[in-house]
């Protein structure tokens, strides 16, 4: 529980993944994760705080770079909630293999890498060198529910036990 202690020390909490999946405001259909041997592939996650979408909007228009950075940190917390759901313990993470970050960007905005630093900085704070991923930071025009950031993460883990995924296979009514 070392990683979770670090989270608490930073004043951060993992969101309730099951609650987010039950709400499914986007109507998207997918599963939370899929494991192949000791590699955990995660679906894209977006920033939530206190159960609500956090820092929504277009970075470089509605939001500053700093607000986008903070949104990336909160999207990372959602990814880590999926890792904990799957593995039961964040300390089983051996390496964050890859992060792909999408930034809902205004025309001409070119600081996507600095926005997605919010993700990698948090991962390094929590996991040290194990949190240094390969990475892409991609600007896009529009994300579901006007989210500012979406993170896709791939993780190498220890042990063999993996909980089955949560499914978003319905439309919220």
PLM features: residue spans?
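N-terminal presequence-like segments and the immediate start of the first folded domain
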Residues: 1-77, 81, 85-97, 105-173
């Amino acid at each position: 529980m070392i990683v979770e202690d670090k989270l608490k020390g930073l004043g951060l909490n993992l969101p309730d993944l099951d609650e987010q999946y039950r709400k499914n405001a986007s109507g998207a259909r997918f599963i939370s994760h899929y494991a192949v041997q000791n590699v955990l592939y995660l679906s894209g996650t977006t920033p939530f705080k206190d159960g609500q979408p956090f820092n929504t909007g277009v970075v470089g228009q509605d939001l500053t770079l700093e607000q986008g950075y903070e949104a990336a940190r909160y999207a990372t917390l959602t990814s880590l909630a999926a890792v904990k759901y799957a593995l039961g313990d964040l300390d089983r993470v051996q390496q964050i293999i890859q992060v792909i970050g999408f930034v809902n960007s205004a025309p001409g905005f070119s600081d996507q890498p600095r926005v997605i630093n919010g993700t990698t900085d948090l991962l390094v704070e929590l996991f040290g060198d194990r949190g240094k991923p390969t990475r892409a930071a991609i600007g896009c025009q529009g994300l579901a529910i006007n989210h500012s950031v979406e993170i896709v993460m791939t993780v190498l883990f220890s042990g063999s036990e993996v909980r089955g995924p949560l499914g978003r296979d319905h439309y919220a009514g």
